[in-house]
Amino acid sequence: MNPTSADFVIPPALETAKPFGETEMYRILCDMEKIVPTKHNLNRVKNMSPFWKGDERSYNWFLDFVKSEWGEWIERYARGSHSLSPVTRKNGSPFQMVQAELWSLIHKPTWISSGFISPTCAVCMTNPVWVDFVWSCKHISTCIKCLKMLSRGSNGFKCPICRCQQRVRNY
């Protein structure tokens, strides 16, 4: 029996492999921003590659958090219930807290130090994280095996995403 094109199913692209502006999370945050404006400009991060690139577990955890906090509220707003006012808390509206958390996650992987989510190497995706790039880019964290491969044959090494010269912090 010869395989046909119908026999092969192309898996959908992973959300974390897409530019941030094409993800479901970005769309949800844009909807939220229409309801409650914040100091963060989502267009500034639209084409970024967030720290979770390739890390579906971390991405899905945060997406579930955003949906659980705001899913029903966004749906009610979309249906025309514009009279809803955001519930305020000590640190601002829940949306502003979600936005602030997202902003920090895009720029600095604080979840590594908190131990909340068990991080894996962003290069091989299997080994636990051993180092975090601590130069200005903060794009990626790696295991010791991938660190050795990245730094082989050079004076130091560069971030594989932005080519910024790196130094490391061990965990």
UniProtKB/Swiss-Prot annotation:
Taxonomy, superkingdom = Viruses
Write the record's keywords in alphabetical order, separated by commas.
Answer: Metal-binding, Zinc, Zinc-finger
Question: GO MF annotations for this entry?
Answer: zinc ion binding
Q: Tell me which Pfam families the record gives.
A: zf-C3HC4_3
User: Where are the zinc-finger regions (RING-type) in this chain?
Assistant: 121-163
Q: Which InterPro entries match?
A: Znf_RING, Znf_RING/FYVE/PHD
Name the family the entry cites: Belongs to the IIV-6 157L family.
Q: What is this protein called?
A: Putative RING finger protein 027R
> Highest lineage ranks of the organism?
Viruses, Varidnaviria, Bamfordvirae, Nucleocytoviricota, Megaviricetes
